[in-house]
UniProtKB/Swiss-Prot annotation:
Residue ranges annotated for the Topo IIA-type catalytic domain, each copy included: 32-497
Residue positions of the active site: Y120 (o-(5'-phospho-dna)-tyrosine intermediate)
Protein name: DNA gyrase subunit A
InterPro entries: GyrA (IPR005743), GyrA/parC_rep (IPR006691), Gyrase/topoIV_suA_C (IPR035516), Topo_IIA-like_dom_sf (IPR013760), Topo_IIA_A/C_ab (IPR013758), Topo_IIA_A_a_sf (IPR013757), Topo_IIA_dom_A (IPR002205), Type_II_DNA_Topoisomerases (IPR050220)
GO MF, one example: ATP binding
Species this chain originates from: Streptococcus pyogenes serotype M6 (strain ATCC BAA-946 / MGAS10394)
Gene, per the UniProt record: gyrA
Upper lineage: Bacteria, Bacillati, Bacillota, Bacilli, Lactobacillales
Record EC number: 5.6.2.2
SUPFAM superfamilies: GyrA/ParC C-terminal domain-like, Type II DNA topoisomerase
Subunit annotation: Heterotetramer, composed of two GyrA and two GyrB chains. In the heterotetramer, GyrA contains the active site tyrosine that forms a transient covalent intermediate with DNA, while GyrB binds cofactors and catalyzes ATP hydrolysis.
Length: 828
């Protein structure tokens, strides 16, 4: 026989229905605030319970356990811990912009410390919390039964200030969450008043009085576009940054001092994170981290090494730690019983509607009360005007019921009026008492007329709302804590995290690249042996050396005619003797593709200029720099090469420069680049020099008549020759002799133009570097051997060289051969 207590249901339907019921219960009754008073049910019940318990600001604190127990027993049967945690949060200055609970005892800290147990702490309502409940006993809001029908609780509080804006809200429901930031009380009230005075105002106009959130912990909001988007749509994101200062100690060291943290950031966790970053070498230059916070305020100190840059470290801290965070707006609240994403204007409109209803209901309550009292006084005045007759009726009546009936019949009184006459004491029969009653009656009639006028005129209701909010503003408002920064600083560029310094970039023949400090090498006299400076093996050698800054962009041109780009700081830093990192780990090179030329391409120096390409077979091409603004990660084609040809080097030119090209067999040709039109990236180019048999191009440079041509041969010989010895001719010729090539000095390793003041760094295939001043190299004619500038071992050859400014000049003025580029001495 079937059990009548069992009901067959479809599991899918039951799961769907039950989950929806549960979700709506969590959404409406637990997790989301009401747009009218800005409170979740638990907070509303705590404040109402404290008010009913008499734990007001003018009374002593009461044990937290008593408060949570009372709230749990009467209104919120969900466990004392959730109630206590909600009450604790309302008592924390770093959580609420205006605390609603005045806590006494340990209520936690912004370091993440929890509050003491509720049996140890005490609490009472704060003064401003009373403004949320003011007039609640005047029928201003609806009440509902509690969970078991034994008590009545308010559906919403009167909320005489816009609490949802002032204290914000956070909460996670089922399938949705809310995150509304706190705001300044004065600004929030001004925004409400602005909407009442100018109903057609825009979000931009509202932001003139409420420019953005005002977090209790202060800090900085970086940029305002995110605020406008959030206020306009209810969703958006802003960047919060700690307020910091860079102090200089008496010893000359710098330290970073944090005085304000972003909202919701745990100071202790930030401390631990910074220490961990320093220990893991992810953030260098920090010597100590101390929390010197006290009752006077927050002070978080980060000590910096003497040689480190506090600004760079601070930028790294902003990127790597919670000293800079994002706050995401999701202004979700309950409107008319339904969860809804609300704009700033919608929040204010809902609050104004609520306040209008509160004022109307309060006015009706006061009017009804005044009318009831006036009705009684009217009866008393009638009795006093007919005192002897009233006394006679009362004396001649056998019972009070008969007396009441006779009075009602004789003077046309109501039951309440006649009862009031019977209850009147004899002392009120004096003439003085009659005057008091008359005065009170007249005042009540005036009050009733005024209250009726309020109900009849909506503009008076608006005026009352504004006046009462102004009074709250006068009593409780305080200055803004969060500073709104003008301009968008929403993200840190990588350059902000890297200290700008002058460095050397070296690239070996086998493709190992590294970055090292430029002052690693000292200048030596001509003929010095040099220092071992590149950490290469016997079968490898340095092929390229570029002097640059860590913030500069480097363009890598390959033998395949492609170009890649890297920031100098993206190249790993190694010690002087370290091997470096294979370039293929940084650039997506194809099989057989090698870097031929590296050019420093600072924007301010490349604007309006061209790249001048020279190939191994003497082909040249000119292309505007702007064609290379957007270089993909896998590179970009710089020029089209003929079969068997390779790119040798690239120059940065103005479009009117003279160019000189040198060949391996010691010949050179000079011509003006204007004879070559600008071509696209996919073009092949035109003939620049007609090569002799078995010859190839080894270098190209810009040239002016007031310069000198510096050539260096493979066996360590070099010389300077006046540029006037090299006449300008048309491109495509075989050229003239630029050096007397013999077995003693060897073939030409490279050719550049110099002013005579530069230092030169010469590199051999053994990785030996020598630095000397160009002035130490003799001036001779074109067809000469030159002088010995570097002592070489028997099997050593010079492979390349580069120019740098002398050591006694400012390092900021270092010129990394932006006018010259030297090809690699590679037999291919």
């Amino acid at each position: 026989m079937q059990d009548r207590n069992l009901i067959d249901v479809n599991l899918t339907s039951e799961m769907k229905t039950s989950f929806i019921d549960y979700a709506m219960s969590v959404i409406v009754a637990r997790a989301l605030p009401d747009v009218r008073d800005g409170l979740k049910p638990v907070h509303r019940r705590i404040l109402y319970g404290m008010n009913e318990l008499g734990v007001t600001p003018d009374k002593p604190h009461k044990k937290s356990a008593r408060i949570t127990g009372d709230v749990m027993g009467k209104y919120h049967p969900h466990g004392d811990s959730s109630i206590y945690e909600a009450m604790v949060r309302m008592a924390q200055w770093w959580s609420y912009r205006h605390m609603l609970v005045d806590g006494h005892g340990n209520f936690g800290s912004m370091d993440g410390d929890g509050a003491a147990a509720q049996r140890y702490t005490e609490a009472r309502m704060s003064k401003i919390a009373l403004e949320l409940l003011r007039d609640i006993n005047k029928n201003t809001v609806n009440f509902q039964d509690n969970y078991d029908g034994s008590e009545r609780e308010p559906v919403v509080l009167p909320a005489r200030f816009p609490n949802l804006l002032v204290n914000g809200a956070t909460g996670i429901a089922v399938g949705m969450a809310t995150n509304i930031p706190p705001h300044n009380l004065a600004e929030s009230i001004d925004a409400v008043k602005m909407v009442m005075e100018h109903p057609d105002c825009t979000t931009r106009e509202l932001m003139e009085v409420i420019p953005g959130p005002d977090f209790p912990t202060g800090a900085l909001v970086m940029g305002r576009s995110g605020i406008h988007r959030a206020y306009d749509t209810g969703k958006g994101s802003i960047v919060l940054r700690s307020r910091t200062e860079i102090e200089t100690t008496q010893t000359g060291r710098e330290r970073i001092v944090v005085t304000e943290f972003p909202y919701g950031v745990n100071k202790t966790k930030v401390h631990e994170h910074i220490v961990r970053l320093a220990q893991e070498k992810r953030l260098e230059g920090i010597t100590a981290v101390r929390d010197e916070s006290s009752r006077e305020g927050v002070r978080f100190v980060i000590e910096i090494r003497r040689e480190a840059s506090a600004t760079v470290i601070l930028n790294n801290l902003f990127k790597l730690t919670s000293l800079q965070t994002n706050f995401s707006f999701n202004m979700l609240a309950i409107e008319n019983g339904v969860p809804k994403i609300l704009s700033l204007r919608q929040i204010i409109d809902n609050y104004i509607s609520h306040q209008k209803e509160v004022i109307i209901r309060r006015t009706r309550f006061d009017k009804d009360k005044a009318e009831a009292r006036a009705h009684i006084l009217e009866g008393l005045l009638i009795a006093l005007d007919h005192l002897d007759e009233v006394i006679a009726i009362i004396r001649n009546s056998e019972t009070d019921v008969i007396a009441q009936t006779e009075l009602m019949s004789r003077f046309d009184l109501s039951e309440r009026q006649s009862q009031a006459i019977l209850d009147m004491r004899l002392r009120r029969l004096t003439g003085l008492e009659r005057d008091k009653i008359q005065s009170e009656y007249d005042d009540l009639l005036a009050l009733i007329a005024d209250l009726s006028d309020i109900l009849a005129k909506p503009e008076r209701i608006i005026t009352i709302i504004k006046e009462e909010m102004d009074e709250i503003k006068r009593k409780y408002a305080n200055p803004r804590r969060t500073e709104l920064m003008v301009g968008e600083v929403l993200s840190l560029e990588d350059e902000d995290l890297i200290e700008e310094e002058d460095v050397l970039i070296t690239l070996s023949n086998k493709g190992y690249i590294k970055r090292l400090a430029q002052d690693e090498f000292r200048a030596q006299k001509r003929g010095g042996r040099g220092v071992q400076g590149t950490g290469v093996n016997n079968d490898d050698f340095v092929r390229e050396l570029v002097s640059t800054s860590t913030h500069d962009t480097l363009l890598f041109f390959t033998n395949f005619g492609r170009v890649y780009r890297l920031k100098a700081y993206e190249i790993p830093e190694y010690g002087r003797t370290a091997k470096g990192l294979p370039i293929v780990n940084l650039l997506k090179l194809e099989d057989g593709e090698t870097i031929q030329t590296i050019i420093n391409a600072r924007k301010e120096e490349t604007a309006g200029k061209s790249f001048f390409f020279t190939t191994k077979q003497g082909i040249v091409k000119r292309t505007e720099v702007s064609e290379f603004n957007n270089i993909r990660q896998n590179g970009l084609r710089a020029l089209k090469l003929k079969e068997g040809d390779q790119l040798i080097n690239v120059l940065l030119t103005s479009g009117q420069d003279d160019i000189i090209i040198g060949t391996h067999s010691g010949y050179s040709v000079r011509f003006n680049e204007a004879s070559i039109r600008n071509m696209g990236r996919s073009a092949t180019g035109v003939r620049g020099v007609k090569l002799r048999e078995d010859d190839r191009v080894v270098g190209a440079s810009r040239i002016r008549d007031n310069q000198e041509v510096l050539v260096i041969t493979e066996n360590g010989f070099g010389k300077r020759t006046s540029a006037t010895d090299y006449p300008t001719k048309g491109r495509g010729g075989k050229g003239i002799k630029t050096a007397n090539i013999t077995p003693k000095n060897g073939q030409l390793a490279g050719l550049v133009t110099v002013d005579g003041t530069e230092d030169i760094m010469v590199i051999t295939n053994k990785g030996v570097i020598i630095r000397t001043n160009v002035a130490n190299i003799s001036q001779t004619g074109r067809a000469t051997l030159g002088v010995k500038i570097m002592k070489l071992d028997a099997d050593a050859k010079i492979v390349t060289f580069t120019l740098v400014q002398p050591e006694d000049s400012s390092i900021a003025e270092i010129n990394t051969d932006r006018e010259n580029s030297i090809s690699k001495n590679k037999d291919n």
